[in-house]
Amino acid sequence: MAEKAKAEGNNFVKKLLSSNLTWSIVAFILLVIICTIFQHDFLALSWNSNTGGLAGPLITMLQESARYLMIATGMTLVISTAGIDLSVGSVMAVAGAAAMQTLSNGMNVWLSILIALAVGLAIGCVNGALVSFLGLQPFITTLIMMLAGRGMAKVITSGENTDASAVAGNEPLKWFANGFILGIPANFVIAVIIVILVGLLCRKTAMGMMIEAVGINQEASRMTGIKPKKILFLVYAISGFLAAIAGLFATASVMRVDVVKTGQDLEMYAILAVVIGGTSLLGGKFSLAGSAVGAVIIAMIRKTIITLGVNAEATPAFFAVVVIVICVMQAPKIHNLSANMKRKRALKAQAKAVAA
């Protein structure tokens, strides 16, 4: 009985150590430790009576991670179908531009939010239609949309960086990015709820299984009764919609859209978050929980860069090194090497015991 319990315990530990999610969490904890060493008040929390929420470096990081959670969730679904969505950063800019411009023109704030979300959904649907029904390559399709999106944002704002901070009645949109729910940043809470809802949709229905099946083999999935074109269309539409939410998070925080910088390079951050979370770029099985942790890690890396005072010129290199280290920590070969070393030590100890 004791041996069976020990064997079950060993199997649990092996599964835990072989999980990408485990190593992602370990990486996050290490980054927190590094930040705490260099910034002693990193984990310090205080109550801000003006905002009605908690304040501190960790809270600021959670606020920033909300936008990454959104685009990483959409990107996870797209990548699991063996696709890619390079347009998410530009969709953020277009959605933000639509919200700020309509608000500046005197439109009701709730209608401005709906228009921004509709624009993101529409771009996602266009991507989905081109990839699924016309059979265009996802990389080329979304690359073109990435370039076109910036142009659309400039057209909407007439090339200006629209500011809606002084517009009356913009409080709901401000709260969307800067408000608090039970002391926790509202945008982070909203993002987590959306991730959970998408996760439930994928795991409590057949949707998740169908997405994975399409990513593994479209022809085989079609033979089992799945309609790959509809699945592909759906995941790109979801990605566009979630990118629009991320765009609102980004622009509402300052009530201003920068048509060049809003969402810039965030498609790369989304892909990195998905990879860190353990979803293969080849498609198939995916982990929304892993991608969520990966998104928070991306925000944590950016916070670490600021805390360590890394030069702006060296920031991309530092970012790349940290991501590579995290990916190496998750590599199956590293796990196998560690397991083999432990096995050899156990055999040596057993041999010594027998010899004695």
Swiss-Prot record:
Keywords: Cell membrane, Membrane, Sugar transport, Transmembrane, Transmembrane helix, Transport. InterPro entries: ABC_transp_permease. It comes from the Bacteria. GO terms for molecular function: transmembrane transporter activity. Its main location: membrane. It is found in: Cell membrane. It is a multi-pass membrane protein. CDD domains: TM_PBP1_transp_AraH_like. One of its GO terms (cellular component) is plasma membrane. The chain crosses the membrane at residues 25-45, 77-97, 113-133, 180-200, 231-251, 268-290, 308-328. The complex is composed of an ATP-binding protein (FruK), two transmembrane proteins (FruF and FruG) and a solute-binding protein (FruE). Belongs to the binding-protein-dependent transport system permease family. Part of the high-affinity ABC transporter complex FruEKFG involved in fructose uptake. Can also transport ribose and xylose, with lower affinity. Probably responsible for the translocation of the substrate across the membrane. This is Fructose import permease protein FruF. The lineage of its organism: Bacteria, Bacillati, Actinomycetota, Actinomycetes, Bifidobacteriales. The gene is fruF.
